[in-house]
Amino acid sequence: MRYLPLTPDDRAAMLGAIGASSIDELFADVPAGARLDGPIAGLPMHASELAVERHMGALARRNRAAGDGPFFLGAGAYRHHVPASVDHLIQRGEFLTAYTPYQPEIAQGTLQMLFEFQSQVARLFGTDVANASMYDGSTACWEAIVMARRITRRSKALLSTGLHPHYRSVARTMAKYTRDVLVDGDPRLEPGTDWAALAGRIDTETSCVVVQYPDILGRIDDMTTLAEACQTAGALLIAVVTEPVALGLIKSPGEMGADIVVGEGQSLGVGLQFGGPYVGLFACKSKYVRQMPGRLCGETVDANGKRGFVLTLSTREQHIRREKATSNICTNSGLCALAFSIHMTLLGEAGLRQLATINHGRAKAAATELAKVPAVSVMNDSFFNEFTLLLPTAARPVVHRLAEQDILGGVSLGRLYPDTAALENGLVVAVTETVTEADIAAFAAALKEVLA
């Protein structure tokens, strides 16, 4: 469709219909100081396409790409290899949208994809059912807390100190406008989790306990005892998974009794992308399905007996009365969910296990080498592909000095917890299949030099 601008006669007719003499009269209520009068200051003149490409290329070169050198950043967003076939397939015109498949008769491909995505997430998390994706991991975590309140009719949520601080921040922001009371704190630099202590703090006002698995420091623990404590007290256990590749090796939260499992799916099929868009994962026990936010795609049979897919549950405020809705999620992360599903399909169960094994093996090798650096130790007694180093000095300046040598050597806890001095010597290091032996050796040598 061509854009045909209004003619002077069109404008005059419209102004006459509303009794205005000029377009400026429409903005009479806007203070003069807030109105734009003339060109925008500092905005360059238009340029040719080639000139714009060169300019944008020059700006892009000021950034450092993840693949330009040794890369050990993690803490919730991980650099994994994404097969070229993933991006190729999601760019097909039939799929290249994140929009809701409102009309099943013309959206069978999208609906089937979401159905398969749900099946994969439920199996990965060890739960009965999963929805068609959320915006990202942090918002999925908050939706789980709200869901627990609806189910238990209680308002206090206990957050593990090992929960990612960004997830805690999102929850605190949202809790300002709800009845939820959040109880949390900063982690301690010690091998074990705080899950045993959490179990002792559950009371009759507790709606849920939220733990991360593996947690922000890379620690892994068995949540079976905590799940039993929650069940005894009538609270729900929410498990947050920020690195789903780990579930190729370690036991799923659902197997250990978690009632709701949420997470971030970025590790599979989705690049780092400057922090987004990502894809939130949400799964739960079947008895809670009607309180689950978002949409649920189901399989059915049409009037002719043919297999088909539909939106089975969609308890969002656009579809039902607002006061009855479980969420207000609109267009969600459908395209990223497709990328996740394609990558999972390409891997298969054996491939995911192999990928997880490679990640863990390289992380063990890195931890061994880095622990040889004088005055450096590995805090964790268990980890998957991420662990915390204890340095003899504040980690944040060390990270900057490593970057000067083109090594992105992890995320300092001083950056994640700027107001907690007790954590400033901690450095969270992630090691995926993209890290080589040469990368590990370079990191260890550079760290030794920086700390000398």
From Swiss-Prot:
Q: What Gene3D superfamilies does UniProt report for this protein, alphabetically?
A: Aspartate Aminotransferase, domain 1 (3.90.1150.10), Type I PLP-dependent aspartate aminotransferase-like (Major domain) (3.40.640.10)
Provide the reaction this enzyme catalyses. Answer: N(6)-[(R)-lipoyl]-L-lysyl-[glycine-cleavage complex H protein] + glycine + H(+) = N(6)-[(R)-S(8)-aminomethyldihydrolipoyl]-L-lysyl-[glycine-cleavage complex H protein] + CO2
E.C. numbers: 1.4.4.2
Domain of life (superkingdom): Bacteria
> Is-annotated flag, keyword Phosphoprotein?
no
Query: What HAMAP family does the record point to?
Result: GcvPA
What name does UniProt use for this protein? Probable glycine dehydrogenase (decarboxylating) subunit 1
User: What is the native source organism of this protein?
Assistant: Sphingopyxis alaskensis (strain DSM 13593 / LMG 18877 / RB2256) (Sphingomonas alaskensis)
What is the organism lineage in this UniProt record? Answer: Bacteria, Pseudomonadati, Pseudomonadota, Alphaproteobacteria, Sphingomonadales
